[in-house]
Amino acid sequence: MKLHSGWLAAGLLLAVVLACNTSKNGNNSNSNNSNNSNNSNKSSNTSSNTRPANAEVYVETIEMAKDKGGEPGESTTSYEPGDRTVHCVAHLNKAKAGTEIRFVWKIVDVAGVNSGELTTVEYTTKSFENKVHAHLTKPADWPTGSYKVEVYINGALDKTVSYTVE
């Protein structure tokens, strides 16, 4: 039987490609796990990750932002009392239509005010949406203190981001 060098080269190339893909896929799952555990460090020093281990869609990064004409502007974790509108921006790991997202604004520590929920905003994603934001507007100055936004994905608490009004 005569071996053709072209077929031999093609077979070796195929074996190398398959070996690289297997190695790459194994490394991706490990790097995703390490990225998930570091998400709070990437997005802000004041966010925390509480998602279920088997979550298909999750918040990859989360940030608070100042208002810029009704849209999220500069990223921040500190507002002035006169900043009437605060935005929370969640970047999802992937776009999946029908993902239910809930933003829950809470008072953490404000002098003379009981801790608790301020408001809730719910949204269901459309196709190709992996960035979702919600905002909260107050008609008067914000009381100084600390606040947080909890972000739920499909009913499960995923991430929390803290901010202050100073």
Regions found by a protein language model. Name each.
Residues 35-38, 44-48:
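Low-complexity, intrinsically disordered segments with a bias for serine/threonine
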Residues 51-144, 150-163:
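Contiguous segments within soluble domain cores/interaction surfaces
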Residues 20, 46-54:
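Ser/Thr-rich, Proline-interspersed low-complexity disordered segments
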Residues 20-38:
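Bacterial lipoprotein signal-peptidase II cleavage site
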Residues 1-18:
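Sec-dependent bacterial lipoprotein signal peptides
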